[in-house]
Amino acid sequence: PADKTTAASIITSGQHIIALGPTANWLGKVWPTQNYQPLWHDLCTAHPTARPAIFYGPGEQEAALARPVLAALPNAIDAGGRFSLTQTAAMLARCRLYVGNDSGLMHLAAATGIPTLGLFGPSRASEYAPAGPLSRWVAAPGGEGVAPIAALPVNTVAHAALTLLEQTEPRI
C-alpha cells in the first residue's frame, strides 16, 4: 500500500502520463536521447494533455542517459533513480503508455499491464520483446539482432506509439 501511495503522489489520477524509458544495460540498446524530443512533439500533438514521465534505474550511467531527455522535456516527471522496484512498478501502472528501450524497465512496464512499446536494435525482439496483450515492439531496419538502434526512425516509433494509444483505453 505504501508503494501505491507514493506512486499516487507522483502520478496523480486523471493525468495522461506517457512513460519514457531512455536507458538500457548496454549502450548498443539505447535509442539516441535526442530522438525523445521529436517523439514527444509527435505524441503531444495528438494528445495535448499528455505529460511525460522519465523512468530510469539507479546509478550514474542511468542518470546520465536520462538527463538529456529530462532537459529536453521540461515538464517531465522525473520518475527514476531513487525509487524501489515496487514503487517504480506502481508508478508505471498509473501511466497511459510506456515507450522505451529493450530493458528491465520495459519488461516491468509490460508486467504491470500497461500498453508497452519496446524499441529494438541489436537485441533480438523475437527473444526479448515485451510480453502481454498490450505490448508491441518496433525494430531498426536491418537484420534482427544486428541493426543499430540509431537507425530506428522517430516517425516509426511515433506511429507505433500513437496506434497503441488508439487501440487501448486509459486504466486510471
Tell what function each PLM region has.
Residues 7, 65-69, 128:
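Hydrophobic packing residues within well-ordered alpha-helices of enzyme cores
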Residues 19-24, 53-55, 139:
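Short beta-strands and strand-loop turn motifs
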Residues 1-29, 33:
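Mid-sequence helix-capping/hinge segment at a functional interface
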Residues 78-79, 107-172:
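Nucleotide-sugar donor-binding patch of glycosyltransferase catalytic domains
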